Amino acid sequence: MGSGISSESKESAKRSKELEKKLQEDAERDARTVKLLLLGAGESGKSTIVKQMKIIHKNGYSKQECMEFKAVVYSNTLQSILAIVKAMTTLGIDYVNPRSREDQQLLLSMANTLEDGDMTPQLAEIIKRLWGDPGIQACFERASEYQLNDSAAYYLNDLDRLTAPGYVPNEQDVLHSRVKTTGIIETQFSFKDLNFRMFDVGGQRSERKKWIHCFEGVTCIIFCAALSAYDMVLVEDEEVNRMHESLHLFNSICNHKYFATTSIVLFLNKKDLFQEKVTKVHLSICFPEYTGPNTFEDAGNYIKNQFLDLNLKKEDKEIYSHMTCATDTQNVKFVFDAVTDIIIKENLKDCGLF
């Protein structure tokens, strides 16, 4: 009888030890789990950052996965040329080449013929000819006056490669592709002995109400803002400047009670497009009070300070900022490495080890 009790208590002690070990393992795993929330207005580059995480931390895109983007690449290319053609009328710009008017009619009649994600050689030739028209180029230069994908020139300048037989999208083609994010997309990966759970949330106004579900237990927020959007308006409200919307959104996030103890990193994205644009369009179009030089450094720093000045708790909370180009893998790799070090440092601070 006594031996029965003894073996029972041994069994119970063993179970207790196993449970203790499991709880310890769970606690360690939780301590190493980083919940990253990607926030920002629509078309600020959040989804491109997620794609970069797959390239940098998850062995990239297989040939099969790249092939799945072929239809998106063609759709983005077609939507871009259609947007420019439509804007020709709105902005009152004339074609230069005599054939372009006829090509426009052909394009509009063939616009629904992207069957099985392929582009016919005839459609490709029409798009190529139109893109080569100086009138279209003049209209493209005024892209901030209508809605046009950032990737328009990237694809339209490379139509020969994109429409060659046997074309398979490469990683740059995938990074430049644009599909509106609806809902919440989670990506998991490991880096520097941490397990990351990254959440990409749709940025358009209609999507933002879904963010609330992600707020609990967030380690770090990466807020993306497009530097190049200073002379553009929202897709969903053409009365609102995109940069002003981004600042308004950042203000509500960085000063939100939910995020009082959350690390916040600001990605001032699309620095490549900004560098190109700032030589042509003065920053005062967005910030009338700005009288400084219209250089990448001066205008870029001014925008950065507009965001950082919104932080009402500067003495308690530091906001880290980086200028980024989300389509540049090396740049994102370097910046994300720095972000991870910030997360590690903040975690050690929380544990009293820093």
Curated annotation (Swiss-Prot):
Which PROSITE patterns does the protein's record reference? Answer: G_ALPHA (PS51882)
Q: Which family does it belong to?
A: Belongs to the G-alpha family. G(i/o/t/z) subfamily.
| Region: G5 motif, residue numbers | 324-329
State the PANTHER family in the record.
GTP-BINDING PROTEIN ALPHA SUBUNIT, GUANINE NUCLEOTIDE-BINDING PROTEIN G(T) SUBUNIT ALPHA-3
Q: Where is the lipid attached (N-myristoyl glycine)?
A: 2
GO:BP terms for this protein? adenylate cyclase-modulating G protein-coupled receptor signaling pathway; detection of light stimulus involved in visual perception; G protein-coupled receptor signaling pathway; phototransduction, visible light; response to nicotine; sensory perception of bitter taste; sensory perception of sweet taste; sensory perception of taste
Specify the inducers. By bitter compounds denatonium and quinine.
Location within or outside the cell: Cytoplasm
PTM note says: Potential N-myristoylation may anchor alpha-subunit to the inner surface of plasma membrane.
The terms describing its cellular component in GO are: acrosomal vesicle; apical plasma membrane; axoneme; cytoplasm; heterotrimeric G-protein complex; plasma membrane; protein-containing complex
Show the ranges annotated as biased composition (Basic and acidic residues). Answer: 8-27
Task: Report the function annotation for this chain.
Answer: Guanine nucleotide-binding protein (G protein) alpha subunit playing a prominent role in bitter and sweet taste transduction as well as in umami (monosodium glutamate, monopotassium glutamate, and inosine monophosphate) taste transduction. Transduction by this alpha subunit involves coupling of specific cell-surface receptors with a cGMP-phosphodiesterase; Activation of phosphodiesterase lowers intracellular levels of cAMP and cGMP which may open a cyclic nucleotide-suppressible cation channel leading to influx of calcium, ultimately leading to release of neurotransmitter.
Q: Matching Pfam families, A to Z? A: G-alpha (PF00503)
Q: Where is this region: G3 motif?
A: 196-205
Query: Where are the residues of the annotated region Disordered?
Result: 1-27
* Name of the featured protein: Guanine nucleotide-binding protein G(t) subunit alpha-3
Additional detail: Transgenic expression of GNAT3 restores responsiveness of GNAT3 deficient mice to both bitter and sweet compounds, whereas expression of mutated Gly-352 transgene do not. Furthermore, in wild-type mice, this mutated transgene acts as a dominant-negative by inhibition of endogenous GNAT3 interactions with taste receptors.
Q: Which UniProt keywords apply?
A: Cytoplasm, GTP-binding, Lipoprotein, Magnesium, Metal-binding, Myristate, Nucleotide-binding, Sensory transduction, Taste, Transducer, Vision
> Which residues are listed for GTP binding in this entry?
40-47, 175-181, 200-204, 269-272, 326
Q: Where is this region: G2 motif?
A: 173-181
Organs and tissues of expression: Expressed in taste buds (sensory organs of clustered epithelial cells) of the circumvallate, foliate and fungiform papillae of the tongue, as well as in nasoincisor, palatal and epiglottal taste buds at protein level. Expressed in enteroendocrine of the gut, in the lumenal pole of a subset of brush cells lining the stomach and the intestine at protein level. Detected in solitary cells throughout the respiratory track. Expressed also in spermatozoa.
The gene is: Gnat3
- Give the record's subunit note: G proteins are composed of 3 units; alpha, beta and gamma, respectively GNAT3, GNB1 and GNG13 for Gustducin heterotrimer for bitter taste transduction. The alpha chain contains the guanine nucleotide binding site. Component of the TAS2R14-GNAT3 complex, consisting of TAS2R14, GNAT3, GNB1 and GNG2; within the complex interacts with TAS2R14; this complex plays a role in the perception of bitterness. Gustducin heterotrimer may also be composed of GNAT3, GNB3 and GNG13.
